[in-house]
Amino acid sequence: MGTIGVPLTAHCVVLFLLQMVALSTEQFTVNGLESPVLVPLGGNLELSCQLSPPQQAKHMEIRWFKNRYSEPVYLYRNGKDLNEAIVYKYVERTELLKDDIGKGKVTLRIFKVTSVDSGSYHCFFKDDKFYEEHIIEVKVTATSSDIQILMHPPNSTGVRLECHSGGWFPQPHMEWRDSKGEYIPATSKSHSQDENEFFNMTMDLFIKSNSYWSAACYIQNFVTHQEESISFVLPGTKVLLLKNIQSIFQSSSVDLEKKDMLLKSIKSRFQSSSVDPEKKERLLKIIQSRIESSSVDQETKALLLESIQSSIENSTVDLETKVWLLESIKSSIQNSSVDPETKELLLERIKSSIENSTVDLGTKEWLLESIQSSIQSSSVDLGTKKMLLKIIQSSIQSFSVYIGTKEWLLERVQSSIQSSSVDLGTKELLLEIIQSSIEGYSVELGIEELLSKIILSSIQSSRVDLGIKELLVKICQSSIQSTSVILETKEWLVKIFQSNIQSSSMDLETKVWLVKFFQSSIQSSSMDLGTIKWLVKNVQSNIQSSRVDLETKRMLLEIIQSSIQNSSVHRGTKKMLLKVIQSSIQSFSVDLETKEWLLKIIQSSIQSSSVDIGTKSMLLKKIGLILRSSIVNPGTELLFQIIQSDLQSSSVNTETREMLFEITQPTVQSSSVNSVTEELLEENYQLLLQSSSVNLEAENILNDTTQRILQLSSVNQGREKLLLDRIQQILQSSSVNPETKCWLLKRIQFILENPSVHQEKKDLLLERIHLILQSSSVQKETKSLLLGSIQSILHSFSVQKETKYLLLEKIQLILQNSSVHQETKDLLLKIIQLILQYSSVHEATSKLLLERIQLILQSSSVQKETKDLLLNRIFSILQNSCVDQGVKYFLLNIIHPILQKTSVHQETKSMLLDRIELILQSSSMQQETKNHLLDQIEQILQDTTVHQETKDLLLNRIELILQNSSVQQETKELLMDKIDSILRYTWVHQETKDLLLNRIELILQSSSVQEETKNFLCNIIASILQSTSMHQEKKKLLLGRIELILQSSSVQQETKKLLLKIVQSSSPSSSVRLESCNKRNPFWKKHALDLGISVFAIIVVTLIRHLNQREADQHFELDTLWSKDTSVILCVLIMFNNRLKALIYFRLYGYSPPGKTYKYIVNYILRFSQPLFFIVYSAIILVMHLQIQNTDSLFSLYNSWMVEMIMVLGLLLAIFNVKNIATALLHLGRTTLRLFRIKD
């Protein structure tokens, strides 16, 4: 059972690819930083922008520019940084960070920012024709805190102050203000800029005597709105009066009533806003010294404190006065020389002020600060501190105290706990207050948050020693585990722990205590499930939080692992922890390293023998839910690595593997599976195939599964594409062993051969084959295997014609692609050659392949080298005697349409003609093949649609063949025959014949041509000249070439002799002799004999008819005689003389066309007149014969003889001139019927 686990799961892993959904990102938006972005002058600027939705941007154009599109700050295109296109002022000052370009995110970095770098920056993405941009506003700024006020020596009128500050950008706003914050006009202002573009500001103020006692210099940056200021206080003088007031209070001789009046006066001064603050400060110093003095009686002190309290509580008293009052209280409390009764009076006043709702919050804050400083002071005795803490505790727990006051109280407690200057005993007292407040029912709910803040900040603070932190954690732990504490309180206590764990400022040791607390609480059997739920939630949030450091997360994950694997932990707790794992894996916010640890927990739990089967079952169910979830993110790829390692691991038992298979099966069948999950799963499939640890049997099962997937009609096309992508990657990978590739290619072959598989799927598969063969990164051995499969597919009878057509289409595209390696093309062409050489290959397949070859050769986009390779293969096919003659015929039939097309490149035609030459010169080539090739050559030269330049190239090759001594004589004779037939054909273009005669002339002039070849060529010339069917114009052209050859000195004597013999042997032919020797003789001299015979025959026949008619008392009609009998005789004569035919035609119709028109009409008569005349006149005579009733007359006998003669002549003509008769019948028309005027 252990060995079956891998194949079963591999099968399931591949089936999972059925749920893949192809993603396409045709459009996008660009997001980036919010404007404005502030950057310090001279610093470095980073501007980021991101494609939404995230997608690959390597292939896109990424352009950063400021004002003009054509002036880029940075340009990235086609995967390259185009530094030469950058504007000169940004050269070597910018760089593009492309770490996340796969997600569509880039960052522009500008070094040493200057003032000109301010402005709008455009982040521009362009994909093909679609583009988007995001604009970011950048503002360069600089702020300085270095402000100085210089006082010049005073004079009789006043004093001059000078405020100076440097290091600002842009130019800031600068002004003077008085103590009340009101604007004072400056005497003068000035500014300057240094070499770094920073502004240096200077401002003067002249203060007259007794006008202002203080002034402040304010500077504000317009961009950041940041303010900096410095104050200057002029020295005061009125001190004597204050000294007198102090002596009154110290004197025991002054009665209490007077002191009371004085205090009221002081109080009114304190509460008055018109009194100079300096005077108030002096008064307060007097009061403070009296309170602290032991010589002052208790009643006086009470009066003093009462006046202070009323001033503090009075809302009309300004804040500065109150601050001074409270400072005096604070120093009195902290003064060890002050007696306890006085301190107690002070604290009572403080408490009543804190609890008084009419006292403003600012005053209470100052009071609480005084309490805090007193608690923290080591000079304050423990009894005083206890009294202070009682005030705090009673105030916190009191419902009458405002919540804001309690907040400040607790903040003071917090600062005291965190202070290193506070002794441990004081801190323990403070912690007791916190604990009693947490566990107390009388504390209102708002205080819980305040207490949590104290605990949180105290635990996080590095200033708090570990002992106090441990005490705080214990307080929280005991409160959480206490049944008397309500659930809401426990909830916020757990939140405290969570925030402490997430804090980056928290030291590791404290976090260890917190994590141990979580572990003990989760694994505790006495803990209620509600509390555990909150604890688990916090563990989850800490794991998923990006603020928690990795080490803390690792500790939390160890808790989860130990809890899952611990048999004593409740099942419900384990379920909650597994949910945490599931949600964390699925979460986008969780980093990959955390997920990796989570999955290691899963892996160790699955592989662990100590974990019970129930826990494993729950764990695997969660894996199934993750796989089937539509919210899985790319980080989940780690899960598939775990599945893969578990399948390959020998430590995983069979039962666990079976469960893994059971949870994977419904995942494959689920329609809600996310496309990312599908892609990850099929990547895992690829890794399994590529892995050397997976045995061949498992790979075979995986490939079988692939085959079945692609054959199913219900499989989504997008998912098929993803599967095919992986097949392509496997075949392209050099790490995959050849056996795996071989198995995979067999499955591909089976798919293509299967007629039940949809044609679209086959097309997708063939598209991948196409890409693999085009790729230069694919190994030659892989390509050879693939091409072997292609060969067997085309060779197979069971493969559908459409599939073969698609495959051949892909082959054509590969051969046409200039980026494909030439070696790959050579391999492909070898396959083509082998296919065509097989006699068992279906004829339809061969035809399809030959069509593709024709298209490749005709295509202008195919490289010359590729065509050369292809033609070499064709040549070797034609040379092979084993190849079926029908296939060779097909190949040769390609030549004509290629040469015929004007769109085919001339270079391609030249290459093809080179091969024709080689074929005809080859001694190993079968004669039958050569015959068929020569037929093709003949057709090409006869074809008027073939370009003249192409024919010229062909005739060049014929010339070279005839001149070549290595060419067999039989081949040359065949070629000569074709030349003969071309020259004889009347429909062959004259220009073509002229080209051919040029070549004949060159051949006969050449000394390298064999004598035997020349003899054969001369015999052809002789036969042409002696032929009666050959047109005189052709003979003229031929004789013209002979004349040039005989005149040439370069022609051998033997050749000339041969030609002269031909001319002499052709001399008996009257037509040739007369045409060549006496070109200027008139027409009647050339045809005198024919004309004489014709006239004599007409006279004889006319006399006989005249005598016959006289005997029969008939009226003689010359027109009737001409139209019946004479025309018959003329018809016989016309049959033997071409010129006479033309003469009769032109004379009868009274028309003699000039020039070429005459020539064309003569050619027309030559072709069609003979059979037409005889057919027409035979029909006329036959009708006449049937109309004659007197059978005894000579006329009847004459007509009978004429009918027989006409019929015999017509029969002979039909036998020897079948082709002309057929042509005449096809071209029968009115003009031909009217050659002679026939009358009844």
Swiss-Prot record:
Keyword Oxidoreductase: no
GO cellular component: membrane
Chief site of localization: membrane
Expression (tissue specificity): Expressed in skin.
Assigned keywords, A-Z: Disulfide bond, Glycoprotein, Immunoglobulin domain, Membrane, Repeat, Signal, Transmembrane, Transmembrane helix
PROSITE patterns: IG_LIKE
Pfam families linked: C2-set_3 (PF22705), V-set (PF07686)
Membrane topology classification: Multi-pass membrane protein
Signal peptide: 1-24
Glycosylation sites: N155, N200, N314
Occurrences of domain Ig-like V-type (ranges): 26-141
Location of the protein in the cell: Membrane
Stretches in topological domain Cytoplasmic: 1108-1125, 1189-1205
Transmembrane segment boundaries: 1087-1107, 1126-1146, 1168-1188, 1206-1226
Every Ig-like C1-type domain range: 142-231
Membrane-side (Extracellular) residue stretches: 25-1086, 1147-1167, 1227-1240
Cysteine pairings via disulfide bonds: C49-C123, C163-C217
Anything else known: Encoded by one of the 11 copies of Skint genes clustered in the D1 region of the chromosome 4.
Family named by the database record: Belongs to the SKINT family.
PANTHER family for the chain: BUTYROPHILIN (PTHR24100), SELECTION AND UPKEEP OF INTRAEPITHELIAL T-CELLS PROTEIN 5-RELATED (PTHR24100:SF152)
Function comment: May act by engaging a cell surface molecule on immature T-cells in the embryonic thymus.
The protein, known as: Selection and upkeep of intraepithelial T-cells protein 6
Lineage start: Eukaryota, Metazoa, Chordata, Craniata, Vertebrata
